[in-house]
């Protein structure tokens, strides 16, 4: 009871399957497909935004891998978006199937961009949302894809259809910013290595590979991390 008292229910309501009253499970693949199709359905009130369902093939088990494009450009094809001049932001969730928070958060974000408080953002940017990059892993609550490959380690060889789908989005929409949402355990490596738990609930980190362009690192720090912290 003492621990529960420290974590009261937040004063917000999210309209996703996982947060339905009495629900104990997360949003299923079938529910996610229906939700994305519903947001992209003709006739949905979007305040002038174009919402397009992007079909990116299927997972190794045959589950559709789908994303949403949200824009105020009249034409929603990649070439037209580049001519329009608005930068594109790509948001990716649940590359690791046992890290579901990213997918659930991106569902809410998509809803807010289409019909909620975040609609004004589309005046300035295009947004592509891939809420569940690894549907097979999500279905089985496993980190890896159906073949046992970690899709988050497959962005060079592109052996898996899940990594190929992300590469397709990057290639076609040329995002200025890519946000890849993950989770980390509380009782994990930090306890084993340091005998302590991490003191933060969220971490924001940009790529730090050795051969990365100095300009990209500088841009990530000055155009992304610092503005996020300042906000």
Task: Please provide the spans of the model-predicted regions.
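M14 metallocarboxypeptidase catalytic domain recognition
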Residues: 1-231
């Amino acid at each position: 009871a003492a621990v529960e008292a420290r974590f009261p229910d937040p004063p917000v309501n999210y309209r996703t399957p996982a947060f339905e009253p009495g629900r104990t499970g997360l949003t299923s693949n079938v529910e996610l497909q229906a939700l994305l199709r519903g947001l992209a359905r003709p006739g949905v009130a979007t305040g002038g935004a174009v919402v397009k369902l992007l079909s990116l093939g299927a997972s190794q088990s045959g589950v559709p891998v789908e994303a949403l494009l949200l824009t105020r450009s009249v034409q929603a094809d990649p070439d037209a978006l580049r001519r329009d001049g608005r930068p594109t932001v790509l948001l990716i969730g649940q590359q690791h199937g046992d890290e579901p928070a990213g997918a659930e958060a991106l569902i809410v974000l998509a809803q807010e961009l289409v019909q909620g408080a975040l609609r004004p953002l589309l005046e300035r940017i295009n947004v592509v949302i891939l809420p569940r990059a690894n549907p097979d892993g999500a279905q089985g609550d496993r980190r890896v894809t159906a073949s046992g490959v970690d899709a988050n380690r497959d962005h060079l060889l592109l052996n898996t259809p899940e990594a190929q789908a992300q590469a397709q989005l990057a290639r076609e929409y040329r995002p200025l910013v890519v946000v890849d949402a993950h989770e980390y355990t509380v009782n994990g490596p930090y306890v084993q290595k340091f005998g302590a738990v991490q003191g933060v609930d969220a971490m924001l980190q940009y790529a730090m590979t050795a051969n990365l362009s100095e300009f990209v690192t500088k841009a990530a720090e000055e155009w992304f991390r610092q503005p996020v912290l300042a906000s």
